[in-house]
Swiss-Prot record:
GO cellular component: membrane
InterPro entries found in the cross-reference section: OPT, YSL-like
Family: Belongs to the YSL (TC 2.A.67.2) family.
Keyword Transmembrane helix: yes
Entry comment describing in which tissues the protein is expressed: Expressed at low levels in roots.
GO molecular function: oligopeptide transmembrane transporter activity
Name of the protein this chain belongs to: Probable metal-nicotianamine transporter YSL17
Its biological purpose: May be involved in the transport of nicotianamine-chelated metals.
Location(s) in or outside the cell: Membrane
Organism: Oryza sativa subsp. japonica
Underlying gene: YSL17
Major localization listed first in the record, in broad terms: membrane
Amino acid sequence: MAEEARGGQRVVVDDDREDASSVASSTERAFEGEPLPSLGETVTARSAAVSGVLGAVVSVVAMRLNLTSGLLPSLGVPAGLLGFFLARVWIRALDVVGVSHLPFTRQENTLIQIAVVSCSTIAFSGGFGTYILGMSGKSANEGHIGSHGRNVEEPNIGRVIAFLFLVNFSGLFIIVPLRKMMIIRHRLTFPSGTATAHLINSFHTPHGAKQARLQVVTLFKSLGATVLWPIFQWFFAGGKNCGFQIFPTFGMAAYRRGFYFDFSTTNVGIGMICPPMITASMLAGSIVSWGILWPYIETKAGRWFPENLDANDLGGIMGYRVFVGVSMILADGLFTILSALVRTACAMRKRRRGASTVTAAVPPFQCLSATERTMQSFDDRRRAQVFLRDSFPTWVAVASYAALAALSVVAVPLLYPQLGHRHVAAAYVAAPVFAFCNAYGVGVTDMNLSATYGKIAMMVFSSWVGMDGGGVVAGLAACGIIVSAVSGSSDFMQDFKTGYLTLTSPRAMLVGQVAGTALGCVVNPAIFWVFYKVYNMGGGGGDGADVAPYARAYRGIAVLSVGRHGLPDHSVLLCKLFFAMALALSAAREVAERRRWRALRYIPSTIGVAVAFFVPPRIPVGMAVGCLALHVWRRHVDAGGARLLLPAVASGLICGDGLGSLASSMLTLLRARPPICIKFVSRFENQKLDAFLATRHA
């Protein structure tokens, strides 16, 4: 047993040889004979061309989906897959004409995937279907409050591009100093990033590795079957509440509360990758919130909050869901930060006292059994060596964020005068805290809550500025600052996980992220501008397919925040209560882990419980199905095979669902309509339906 210092990071390694099982299940053994490409061999003209073409094409699809449905399938896996095939086509073309070329490596494939995803996700985080369109007069014309004057700002392509360049790079520099802590020390899962990495590794596995070929075959079997499943489901979703995805697994009463299995293979795959404690915690949180708390609060309609409000109105039941869940996430995140600061201070104090060895502190992350593990496998040592080799100075990241914040404090009020300099400064002070909490949650549960943090910022800044000062536009613009920073941070950390598992240089990842973000800040506004001019976006009177549904919702939240305090009755009290409970739960897990209590396995994860307050219960149910399938596979089928093939199977489930959803979305974009409707009704409703049909036939 020995310690190696790499890039200032202490990594514990085992000098003994790995046992036969660990060697057999090693991914990096298959690539051991391949030299690692340099930065110049990763960032090539080929990767730049493929990234540019794919980024633009995928952005068109993402923008169209954003402006019509507000939904977006996972783009990471399709980007990696399409990048692989386009690069192969490029190579074949060069071979035909006899031009020499560099080998296409998994590191270059990862770079393409990072650039394409960072470009296309700006279609959503850029707010084209939400806060930017919500500022327009088309969205305001339907309302009677704040529909003119300083509370309306028509979209302008030049202003939008400038705003995106100011706010979209800040999230990258927030998260860079935390990459070692989250990826190396605490081993956060980042399920989507892990799935993408296994997919890319499978594409580039050397032919001599028998085990790798088995993983590739398994992955493509899982992928192929899963791709067809969403397309098959589409044929039976020919109406509202139709299709297999609304199967009332536990009965109609549970279905109405959201407790059912929706046959989403993405959730099943995530459940197979995530630790069982996370899945159990999310199930517990769903039962407490969706099974007990929200039904009770709904009985208070008319007293605690107005009746007949829209389901997404933060002045109603949605307000309790958002604020109570956010209070728990903030409590756990702040506890984690404070614990890390205390442990760091203690370690520094011991060093100053001349201690020869500083015992590694137990990290404060509760969700993942995050105690620093001994890096015993060849894969762990190899990946850590590459990941820590090209390190970024922390002061450079901090200075870059400070410079971007200072530039935004000056420039954003010129673009949106409703936001003052102090408002922008306050947003940039709060953004790192939100970004850390969100990246932590994404690493554990794969749930990105950046839009939720943006809504919180929208309400705060709208109330701060007020109606007369243009609080509606101010809140929407502040939402953009927070969403861009928070979403960019979590997306980049997902990419760090992908790069860690594919031995991609962190510097190459930063280049790909910056290049893709810069491209997205230009391409997406141009695409949006075409849609905005050609179609009737943001207002009524269109052809029905061109109305952005979330633009009015976001503007309604801002108007609600300006016109009244915005918070439903007793929500602040509930937030305080659950904030205290979350702190107590985090402290209990910390004490139990420090003292190695057996009760630790029964104390739920705070972040898992909190996320369940937002997401529908069908997601934890799907994850539980995946966790149960993995348990049966390990205990009753083949433990060795489960250890070897689990990443491939889970990746195929997640990736295939993303590709299949993209294909079914394309059918929707082509205005194709499913021919069949499968609907589940109760026995009494079926009797009424039969009676009605009998009268029609008579």
